[in-house]
Amino acid sequence: MTVSISSYLMVALILFCVGLYGALTKRNAVVVLLSIELMLNAVNINLVAFSKFGLYPSVTGQIFTLFTMTVAAAEVAVGLAILIALYRNKETVNVDEMNQMKR
């Protein structure tokens, strides 16, 4: 039994839509950060799917996915560090209350 490219793309679309919904509607900064990570994972699924089912199947999509995952890990580390610093100053993780970076 083989899985077609449309199945991969449908899973990626659902993941991206859930991530976009969370990023646009939620007010908790941690949830927004996790939603952005969901969107990046949807992109990774697309890269691997197009790499596997392309005209000339290769590992290029998987290499780009590894690079994207590395950048996403750095993004999470920096984002969480900023959130911890903001929480210490403002004592909230609500996005609406974090409109300025000065003390």
From Swiss-Prot:
GO BP of this protein: ATP synthesis coupled electron transport
Keyword NAD: yes
Top-rank taxon, per record: Bacteria
Enzyme nomenclature, EC number: 7.1.1.-
Membrane association type: Multi-pass membrane protein
GO cellular component: NADH dehydrogenase complex; plasma membrane
GO MF term list: NADH:ubiquinone reductase (non-electrogenic) activity; quinone binding
The UniProt record lists the keyword Metal-binding: no
Major subcellular location class: membrane
Major enzyme class: translocase
HAMAP family in the cross-refs: NDH1_NuoK (MF_01456)
Role noted for this protein: NDH-1 shuttles electrons from NADH, via FMN and iron-sulfur (Fe-S) centers, to quinones in the respiratory chain. The immediate electron acceptor for the enzyme in this species is believed to be a menaquinone. Couples the redox reaction to proton translocation (for every two electrons transferred, four hydrogen ions are translocated across the cytoplasmic membrane), and thus conserves the redox energy in a proton gradient.
Protein name: NADH-quinone oxidoreductase subunit K
Source organism per UniProt: Brevibacillus brevis (strain 47 / JCM 6285 / NBRC 100599)
